[in-house]
């Protein structure tokens, strides 16, 4: 039986599920709307769709080393309670294993685990999202996890202990680039324009302002690059100086932190309780 767009729309309006999920459900029931809804409820698709709008800014970062590479994975949920749940962590580790086995792209991972994700959402009652997967190549690498929320992998030419310590530094200090010279030209230009404007507003003579900007730019690129930062274990040295003493070099790193860039909704607890009380009175 051919399924019409109107039928798909009606099922979508009634369940909140995605178009493809609705079409599939209707095809499986030969267009029987009520049976399709019942089946979707059983599978959890309708419940997962309702949760999809909820902000998932908590979760975990996982790391796994492969042959000459490592994979970092972020899987999100809504609360730190669920982030520690065995079912959630089991799901996240299953995704990690598949990613590490063949460097699967994010969208392919999402598609492969969508059915399991929907079932998990229905079971635990929170939105779940496979948000990021990153791969980093290197003959020699070290990884570090700070709790469940921060993961770092560093590659380079150094002994295991040195690379491990650098990974810990990256976790704490959040550098954006390996070296000051790696900072993109547009980032440098934007900051330089800002510093020139600040110096002019301070009323400095042009020659003094120019020297001040040079110094500020050196500080700026140093603070956002790994080798220019003060080394957390020996703050009187930069990371670059520490690496030079060790005859070591860092070639690349990746740092992931749970919820980066996600605007988490601020909950008003009192208002939430009041709303629940009001809702219970209407029931």
Swiss-Prot record:
Keywords: Cytoplasm, Elongation factor, Protein biosynthesis. GO terms for cellular component: cytoplasm. It comes from the Bacteria. It is found in: Cytoplasm. One of its GO terms (molecular function) is translation elongation factor activity. The gene is tsf. It holds the Pfam family EF_TS. Residues 79-82 are annotated as: Involved in Mg(2+) ion dislocation from EF-Tu. SUPFAM superfamilies: Elongation factor Ts (EF-Ts), dimerisation domain, UBA-like. This is Elongation factor Ts. Its main location: cytoplasm. Belongs to the EF-Ts family. InterPro entries: EF-Ts_dimer_sf, Transl_elong_EFTs/EF1B, Transl_elong_EFTs/EF1B_dimer, Transl_elong_Ts_CS, UBA-like_sf. Associates with the EF-Tu.GDP complex and induces the exchange of GDP to GTP. It remains bound to the aminoacyl-tRNA.EF-Tu.GTP complex up to the GTP hydrolysis stage on the ribosome.
């Amino acid at each position: 039986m051919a399924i019409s767009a109107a039928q798909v729309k009606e099922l979508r309006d009634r369940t909140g599920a995605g178009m493809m999920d609705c079409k599939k459900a209707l095809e499986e029931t030969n267009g029987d709307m009520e049976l399709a809804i019942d089946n979707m409820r059983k599978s959890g698709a309708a419940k997962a769709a309702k949760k999809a709008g909820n902000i998932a800014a908590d979760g975990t970062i996982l790391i796994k080393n492969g042959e000459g590479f490592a994979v970092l994975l972020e899987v999100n949920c809504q609360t730190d309670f669920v982030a520690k749940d065995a079912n959630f962590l089991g799901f996240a580790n299953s995704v990690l294993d598949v990613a590490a086995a063949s460097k699967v792209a994010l969208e392919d991972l999402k598609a492969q685990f969508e059915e399991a994700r929907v079932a998990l959402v229905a079971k635990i009652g929170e939105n779940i999202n496979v948000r990021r997967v990153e791969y980093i190549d290197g003959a020699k690498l070290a990884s570090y996890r700070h709790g469940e929320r921060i993961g770092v992998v560093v590659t380079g030419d150094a002994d295991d202990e040195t690379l491990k310590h650098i990974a810990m530094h990256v976790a704490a200090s959040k550098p954006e680039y390996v070296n000051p010279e790696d900072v993109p030209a547009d980032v440098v230009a934007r900051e330089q324009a800002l510093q020139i404007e600040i110096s002019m507003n301070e009323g400095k003579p042009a020659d003094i302002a120019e020297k001040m900007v040079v110094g500020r730019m050196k500080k700026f690129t140093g603070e956002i690059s790994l080798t220019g930062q003060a080394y957390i274990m020996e703050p009187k040295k930069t990371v670059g100086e520490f690496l030079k003493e060790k005859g070591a070099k860092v070639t690349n790193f990746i740092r992931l932190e749970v919820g980066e860039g996600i605007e988490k909704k601020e909950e008003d607890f009192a208002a939430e309780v009041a709303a629940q009380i009001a809702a219970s009175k209407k029931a």
